Regions:
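Terminal, low-structured helical/coil segments at or just beyond the last alpha-helical repeat
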Residues: 183, 190-221
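Short coil turns that delineate tetratricopeptide repeat
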Residues: 71, 115-117, 158
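TPR alpha-solenoid repeat register
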Residues: 76, 120-122, 163, 197
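N-terminal leader/linker segments that initiate helical-solenoid repeat arrays
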Residues: 24-62
Length: 221
C-alpha cells in the first residue's frame, strides 16, 4: 500500500501549501477564501487526529464550491489545492492519488493566472507535492520539479514561513542536512502574519521539531 506522509501533505505545502501550506499575501484574499483558509488552520492544527479527515472532507466540499464560484481567482484555486492535499495526507493510500492530482491542477492553474499570488504559495504547495507524491508509474513525484518550484517560491518571498519550511523538509529528504537546518531556522524566525496565529504557531512548531532532528543528525556525524 502507498502511504502518503501526512505531516508533510497536510499543508501543502505544501502548503502548504500544501499549504499544507497556510499563506498570507500583501492583499487580503476575498472573504470566502479567508473562511476556507481559517477553517483549514483549525482542521490542520486544532482538530484531533481522529476527526481530522472528516473535517477536511467537509472543507473540501466548501473549497470545491469556492472554485466553482471563483474559477479565475488564484487564491481560491490555491486553497482548494491545499485542502485537497491535506485530505490526501490524512486519507493515504491509492485513494489519495486522485486528490493530489486535482491539487496539482489547482496549483498549475493558479500559477498560470498569477504565479506570485499569496506570496508564491502555489509554487510552495506544488513543490511540496512533487517531493512527497510517489514517482512514475504510480504518481507524478519529481525531485527536480520540487526543487524548481520551491526555489521559485523563495525567489518570490525569501522570508515566507511555509516556503522555508518545505524547502528545509525537501533538503532533509535529499540528505542536505546543513541546508535543511538553515531553511528550518529561517522558517522559525519568519515574521508573524496578521490573523494567522493558529497556522503560524503550528508551522513554527513543526519547523522546530524538524530542526531538532536535523541538528541531532549533524551532531552525530
Amino acid at each position: 500500500m502507498i502511504r502518503f506522509r501526512s505531516d508533510r501533505l497536510a499543508a501543502a505545502l505544501l502548503a502548504a501549501c500544501l499549504a499544507v501550506p497556510a499563506f498570507a499575501s500583501a492583499a487580503e484574499p476575498a472573504a470566502p477564501v479567508v473562511v476556507v483558509r481559517d477553517q483549514w488552520a483549525q482542521a490542520a492544527y486544532v482538530t484531533p487526529k481522529a476527526q481530522r479527515e472528516a473535517a477536511l472532507a467537509t472543507l473540501a466540499s466548501q473549497s470545491e464550491a469556492l472554485i466553482a464560484a471563483r474559477p479565475r481567482d488564484p487564491d481560491a484555486l490555491i486553497w482548494d489545492g491545499i485542502v485537497r492535499s491535506s485530505l490526501a495526507g490524512e486519507r493515504g493510500g491509492l485513494g489519495a492519488l486522485s486528490l493530489v492530482k486535482q491539487a496539482r491542477r489547482d496549483f498549475e492553474a493558479a500559477i498560470a493566472l498569477d504565479d506570485a499570488a499569496l506570496g508564491g504559495a502555489a509554487h510552495t504547495s506544488l513543490g511540496a507535492l512533487y517531493y512527497q507524491v510517489p514517482g512514475w508509474p504510480v504518481g507524478f513525484g519529481d525531485d527536480a520539479k520540487a526543487r524548481e518550484h520551491l526555489q521559485r517560491a523563495l525567489a518570490i518571498d525569501a522570508g515566507d514561513i511555509d516556503a522555508n519550511y518545505f524547502y528545509g523538509d525537501f533538503l532533509r529528504d535529499q540528505g542536505d542536512w546543513a541546508g535543511a537546518a538553515a531553511a528550518f531556522e529561517k522558517a522559525i524566525a519568519a515574521p508573524a502574519r496578521p490573523g494567522r496565529d493558529v497556522a503560524d504557531r503550528g508551522r513554527r512548531a513543526e519547523a522546530t521539531r524538524k530542526l531538532a532532528e536535523v541538528r541531532q543528525h549533524l551532531a552525530s556525524r
